[in-house]
Structure formats: structure tokens, C-alpha cells
């Protein structure tokens, strides 16, 4: 460890910034946010200084540095391109035993400024020790996505209840209690702006702990998106990493499953065509049972839980049994897969509406409003349609679409194994068989498919995909 991380209390302290550049303005802003009074020595100030908060605590005291400016100062920051000039300031500060930071010159620093994640009063600092500030900023950006902005409010809530917890809970149990609180629905309530509910839940947890009553569980119904872990929402990822149990379907990709809490129990419930590992009714009651055992239960579904995901049925059961739950939307396959295939679902010149339908066969037939679906100015997105693809295409032609209507089928959309086959309603069933496509797939029908050749941007297997893809005009032997 090259540096010892230390947080300085600069409130009402006096600091000097040498330099008037945009970077100097950013350094001055940090000092002002920490409550310091800031003096600036520079021949001119960047416009960024005009935008700083609490400017009444900032004063330009000189055009150039002189040692006398260090009188009464508690810290010095130097932003100076001229190495010799920076050396003079650093030496003068060190001679007075003042902490000094020189931007981009670690050798002249007695302290360094980390990248900061501010969730006051919670503060997180990330530093590369001056070796790679850009890398530290990138790491900070990643952490920003994982730490909700409401953490400050959560900390304030805990502070208000600290005395109550001290009175109600034995010293040896307090640490475990607060860990349970911060990993419970109390935190999620604060993050979603339900502060009064969070206080009520915290009150209940204090009473339960004092009386040694069992913990109260909750169900997180989370959409995992179309498969690519980069498409998870921040909220989904946060809940995935705090759940005690993960109940997941076949359509949840392994990379996404790997992002769940490592020590969480995992329960696979299948949900594959004609092979439901666990019947839906049993899944519903499993969620109730797990929550009533006090477990934070993650119900992880591919896509969005409310679009052909049977999420509504599951939370109906939870409501009937008085189980707390929350729903996190996911990017549905239609939106995610179409985007990665380079096919816009709507377009001013081609489609003014879009229909999501399920291609699931029931007794070898479809139960669809074909007249409402088979419209030339509409894009049709068909989930779970691979098995019935020939019948789907035939029915769409029968109900008004032409045989040469553009159509595409996408396998493993958004993943590195994505494959896209394009053709027409007349040719797509044969092309899908020749390509050997396997579920999961998504079918897109409509004139917007014409845009794929121009707009395709995601090519994880460019050479293989080019060989598999077929132009809209089918070869003679397939026409």
C-alpha cells in the first residue's frame, strides 16, 4: 500500500488553489463541497469558477504564487503545467508542513485526491496512487452504478434509530441486526422513495429482534432482459446480489446467473416448451413458502416478467398470501433482440405500430386475432414461434400479408452466439430448418426487416453470421 487513505475534515478550514484552469476549478469545487474556504492564485480564472457552488467562500487573492499566500492555510492544491513553478509551490508548502497536492505530478504530492463517490454521509474513494487516474475514474463510474444515490438517506435513517437499537438489542447482536437491516427491504424502500414504509419496517424489525421473532421475507420479481448481462438494470443487479434464494428459468443466461449472490441457494424451475420442470402452480406456492421462511427470494425471468412471463400470475398468488414483493422490469426480448439485430420495430416509412404475440401452439393451433395482427403497416414480433413457424407464416399470408413480406428469425439474440436469418414469409420456414436454428428464437415480420442489411451493427461472429444470413430475395430453388 503506497498511500494510507485518510479523510480530512476541512469544514471552515482555509485552503489555497494555485492555478485558474478548468482542472483547477474542479479541484476548488471539491474543497468547497467539503466546507472549506478557498483562496485562488492565478492570472485568470476559467469560466468554470463562475459555476461553482458556495462561491462566497471562494476568493481570488493574487495573480501569481508567493510564499506569503500560505499563511493561515491548512492545505494546498497546485494545478500548474510549468514543472518548475509547481516545484516552487510544493517546496514552500512542505517547508511549512502543509499537505500539498500537485495535479498530474505524484512525486511532488504529500497527498493525492482520489476519485470520489459521494453519498453523504457515505463516501467512497478510489485511487490508483497517481499511477492511472483515468483507470480510477472508470472504476469509480462502475461503482457509481452499484451504489444508489439514496444511500445517504439510508445512512441518515440508521443514525436516527441508533439509540433505539442500542436500547432494544444486546451489544453482541447489534452488528448482525444492522447487517440484516441494510440487506432487507428497508433499504429497497428507501431507494424507491418509500421512506415512511422503511421506518415502519425498521420499527417492526427492532420489535422482532427484541422478541426473537422470525424474519420477514420478500419476493423480487426481476426481469433479466434478453440475455446479455450488460442489459440488466441497476436495480435488477442490486437485488440479484442480495437475494438468499434464486428461482430461475431456462431463458436466464449463465452469464447473468453468475452475477447473482455467490452463496445464494439456486432453484431451477425450467419453463421449456413441453417440458416444465416445475408446474407454474408449484412455482407460485414455492415463492410463498420461501418468503414466509424469511428468505429474500429472487424470481429471475428472461426478458420482462410481465410480457409472456406469467409474472402477473405469480404476484397474484403473493398478494393472496400476504407476501411482500416488488417488480423490476427487464428489457423484453422484442426490444433487445430487435435492436441487436439492427431491425427497428417502428419506422416512419415502414411501420406505425408493433404487435407482440406468442407463437405457442395449443392443441396444434393458434388462438390469435389474425385480422388485427396481419397488417402491412405493422411490425409483428413473435415469441416462442420456432416450432410453429410454418403454420404462422401460412396463416399470416392467408389473412392478408403477401408472401414476399420481409421476415427474420433471431437465435440467441444479444449474446455472442447470436444468429440472424432473413427472408420472407414464403421462405423463412425453410431457411430456419436449413440453418439448424434452436430455441430460444424471436421472429420479426414486417417491412422494417428490410433495414437490417443497412443497420446491422452487432456482429459477434461476423464471418459465420454473414454466411448464415440470407438476403430478402430467396434463391430460385426456394422461391
Curated annotation (Swiss-Prot):
Pathway: Cofactor biosynthesis; adenosylcobalamin biosynthesis; precorrin-2 from uroporphyrinogen III: step 1/1; Cofactor biosynthesis; adenosylcobalamin biosynthesis; sirohydrochlorin from precorrin-2: step 1/1; Porphyrin-containing compound metabolism; siroheme biosynthesis; precorrin-2 from uroporphyrinogen III: step 1/1; Porphyrin-containing compound metabolism; siroheme biosynthesis; siroheme from sirohydrochlorin: step 1/1. This is Siroheme synthase. It comes from Thiobacillus denitrificans (strain ATCC 25259 / T1). NAD(+) binds at residues 22-23, 43-44. The modification Phosphoserine is found at residue 128. Then it catalyzes the NAD-dependent ring dehydrogenation of precorrin-2 to yield sirohydrochlorin. Finally, it catalyzes the ferrochelation of sirohydrochlorin to yield siroheme. In the N-terminal section; belongs to the precorrin-2 dehydrogenase / sirohydrochlorin ferrochelatase family. In the C-terminal section; belongs to the precorrin methyltransferase family. Residues 1-202 are annotated as: Precorrin-2 dehydrogenase /sirohydrochlorin ferrochelatase.
Amino acid at each position: 500500500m503506497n498511500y494510507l487513505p485518510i479523510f480530512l475534515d476541512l469544514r471552515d478550514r482555509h485552503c489555497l488553489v494555485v492555478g485558474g484552469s478548468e482542472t483547477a476549478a474542479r479541484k476548488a469545487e471539491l474543497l468547497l463541497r467539503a466546507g472549506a474556504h478557498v483562496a485562488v492564485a492565478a492570472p485568470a480564472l476559467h469560466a468554470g469558477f463562475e459555476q461553482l457552488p458556495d462561491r462566497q467562500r471562494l476568493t481570488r487573492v493574487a495573480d501569481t504564487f508567493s510564499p506569503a499566500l500560505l499563511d493561515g492555510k491548512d492545505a494546498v492544491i497546485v494545478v500548474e503545467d510549468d514543472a518548475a513553478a509547481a516545484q516552487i509551490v510544493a517546496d514552500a508548502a512542505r517547508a511549512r508542513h502543509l499537505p500539498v497536492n500537485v495535479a498530474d505530478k505524484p512525486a511532488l504530492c504529500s497527498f493525492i485526491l482520489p476519485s470520489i463517490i459521494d453519498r453523504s454521509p457515505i463516501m467512497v474513494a478510489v485511487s490508483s496512487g497517481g499511477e492511472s487516474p483515468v483507470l480510477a475514474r472508470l472504476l469509480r463510474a462502475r461503482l457509481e452504478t452499484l451504489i444508489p444515490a439514496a444511500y445517504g438517506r439510508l445512512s441518515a435513517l440508521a443514525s436516527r434509530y441508533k439509540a433505539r437499537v442500542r436500547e432494544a438489542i444486546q451489544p453482541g447482536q447489534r452488528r448482525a441486526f444492522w447487517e440484516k437491516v441494510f440487506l432487507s427491504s428497508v433499504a429497497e424502500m428507501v431507494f424507491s422513495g418509500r421512506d415512511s414504509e422503511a421506518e415502519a419496517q425498521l420499527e417492526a424489525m427492532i420489535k422482532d429482534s427484541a422478541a426473537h421473532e422470525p424474519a420477514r421475507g420478500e419476493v423480487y420479481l426481476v426481469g433479466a432482459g434478453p440475455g446479455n448481462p450488460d442489459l440488466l438494470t441497476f436495480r435488477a443487479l442490486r437485488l440479484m446480489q442480495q437475494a438468499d434464494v434464486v428461482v430461475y428459468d431456462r431463458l436466464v443466461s449463465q452469464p447473468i446467473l453468475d452475477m447473482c449472490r455467490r452463496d445464494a441457494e439456486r432453484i431451477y424451475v425450467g419453463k421449456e416448451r413441453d417440458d416444465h420442470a416445475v408446474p407454474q402452480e408449484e412455482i407460485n406456492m414455492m415463492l410463498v413458502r420461501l418468503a414466509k421462511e424469511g428468505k429474500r427470494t429472487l424470481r429471475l425471468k428472461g426478458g420482462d416478467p410481465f410480457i409472456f412471463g406469467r409474472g402477473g400470475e405469480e404476484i397474484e398468488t403473493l398478494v393472496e398470501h400476504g407476501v411482500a414483493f416488488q417488480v423490476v422490469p427487464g428489457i423484453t426480448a422484442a426490444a433487445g433482440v430487435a435492436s441487436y439485430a439492427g431491425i427497428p420495430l417502428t419506422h416512419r416509412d415502414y411501420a406505425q405500430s408493433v404487435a407482440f404475440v406468442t407463437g405457442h401452439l395449443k392443441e396444434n393451433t393458434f388462438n390469435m386475432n389474425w385480422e388485427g395482427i396481419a397488417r402491412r403497416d405493422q411490425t409483428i414480433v413473435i415469441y416462442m414461434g420456432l416450432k410453429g413457424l410454418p403454420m404462422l407464416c401460412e396463416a399470416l399470408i392467408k389473412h392478408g400479408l403477401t408472401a414476399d413480406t420481409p421476415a427474420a428469425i433471431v437465435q440467441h439474440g444479444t449474446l455472442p452466439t447470436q444468429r440472424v436469418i432473413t427472408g420472407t414469409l414464403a421462405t423463412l420456414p425453410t431457411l430456419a430448418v436449413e440453418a439448424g436454428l434452436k430455441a430460444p428464437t424471436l421472429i420479426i415480420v414486417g417491412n422494417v426487416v428490410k433495414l437490417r442489411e443497412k443497420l446491422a451493427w452487432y456482429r459477434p461472429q461476423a464471418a459465420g453470421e454473414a454466411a448464415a444470413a440470407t438476403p430478402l430475395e430467396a434463391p430460385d430453388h426456394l422461391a
